[in-house]
């Protein structure tokens, strides 16, 4: 059906409901429904604000901010007939929000989400009839606000590249009206029936920049005089797909209240080498109203680091400006500059955000409210535990909360695991909060600094852990589309997906351990959920990738045009040859060490072997050629044996024999056996002893550390590493007050202060991969690839008395699985439950023989 022209009515639009509604209300109208047929898009076009401000010139450096202002698009429609239903299919170039008659539509935020900016946009369709006046002749106001996030901001812009330069935000939508007589009409965005302009209270908003909000301004649907004819936007020529995974929500169920709050004014102990210590003038009790005056700073501690936004209920005179600055950590040690502090002890530390003065801001200007008003940012997010609040006139804060933001909803969460050890429980909590914070439209690395990208190694090392805590199948279907969109013509996968400010350039491809996420993630989703659709969707892309690395033997030099002659490798490890620290290069400045190239080629060959084995599994599950990949895996294994290992289990590159990660990959991939294996295991045990029972591994080595030790009879070492509290270890961060997983083992050190500020996140989930081992070894719940999706469960708990007990419950694809054990004296008591339709292969501690159990609840005493 062709769209019937509708005249925009600009005069006489006076609706009390419009003026009563704030653009930051949280009670939504509109239920999300299935998308209209693709053909419906033919009734619409992309529209932008004519002469809208854009970023010009070349982007260099990290401080470039998005263009100011929010674009509003408004159409007023008179009903030709009585309406019975209305579906509105929408998408945007930039973060957009929908309003019908002043009512905010939908509970999803940050729409349309983070995708490849030029290849894919996601659409959201809502049933909006409840927000309409339905009678014939009634008028309804459809309005959209769009800000630069995901499209015209720094997150997608390479230094010196186009990206946000010249980009205009845009909207596209189709409204399907069904009338009482059964007929339908389609009304689409166009340049004749819509008005557009830069208007409203949002003065600036972007993913990295934060949000500036002036409550004195009315929303765009109330200021039609500021709007004019839009222009057609032709910047996006990609595909629009219905959103089905990766949507972002406020987690109201996890709302955080202040655990501590205080005012400070002035500093003592300041010197040339130290910022000193804040002078606290008042501490607030829980629930007490907080008052901030000019010259004072209010610090609020919510007790939990996470991706979130502050939500205020506050009051001040018209024109008062409040500035809120989030941070992950406080300055300490009298603000000693030698400790990396950026302010006095007790103040919020923001240097690790990398743009502390120009990014991650929240500025609010008060309107002439006679009473308390509410506000929270909707068009950005922050990563923080603390906020620092100042104001230029008195502000009274009746309530402030931190509202977590995530793609993991309460309904998606599937697993809980607790022990009798408080430190281990905190580590589990830190991991879960890291997942909630970083599964945000894409699996990001961190939510706080000017990065927030879909780093592919972070994703693959944590993927299996994440499947226990939440049903991530749809989330990863969406992200694997981002991976395919960003895949190179040769088949190489990127360092980040989707395309972003860095990590996905033509020389950031085929980075070992990163590129392999293109195979590892679909394999994990298939194994954990029994999902073969993800294999089918990605098979051609995975096959192209495997053919490419097989032809080149994943050799670093052969792929140097794609990898930029650099590898991240076992990122942030404490071992020799680590890349970030520069230990991979010669001390005389002559460049990369020959041993480093050997290391990179050894690791990449191991991933070639891993990838081929996973492809064989997935081929067999979907009726494809598994033998091809079995042969490829055998070829990769022989290549590693010939090139890197001696017959006695020693590495040909001598320095490998002093490291943990090379041995772990050799053991994981069964490269050694017999005496050679015994020799390697002895060297590995000795290595741990030499390092005081501390791990030395980075992102890649840590991901295989605990399972590999356990599979090779070294669960005693695995438990020593779990309980270790020295640096580096998991519990070192717990002892230092962490509430999420850190990027570095030493992101903060009690004796030395902050880690390197140029790259120092306190909310990185990668090292939370230890929880995969907790689920599969401590609790003894793992999937069997012979019958994926937990139809066949491997239950092989390995207990340790220091835990006292473990209680684990997992709502798997096959149903609820339970495993709980405890010690009573020397007696070990294990209760476990298997869901209907599933079977379990049960192996008791200290035994090797597995016994099959069918659905039911059981207790074993040993």
What is each PLM-predicted segment?
Residues 2-9:
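Bacterial N-terminal signal peptides that target proteins for export
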Residues 19-20:
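C-terminal motif of bacterial Sec signal peptides marking the signal peptidase cleavage site
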Residues 25-449, 474-475, 497-499, 533, ...:
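Extracellular/oxidizing-compartment recognition motifs
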Residues 86-87, 309-328, 387-390, 458-487, ...:
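Alpha-helical support elements that line or immediately flank enzyme active sites
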Residues 95, 189-198, 394-430, 436-437, ...:
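Active-site acid/base region of carbohydrate-active enzymes
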Residues 107-118, 329-357, 473-590, 729-752:
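Helix-terminus loop motifs that line ligand-binding clefts
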Residues 142, 213, 450-451, 469, ...:
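C-terminal capping/lid segments that line or modulate ligand- or cofactor-binding pockets
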Residues 163, 167-174, 187-225, 234-235, ...:
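Non-catalytic C-terminal accessory modules of carbohydrate-active enzymes
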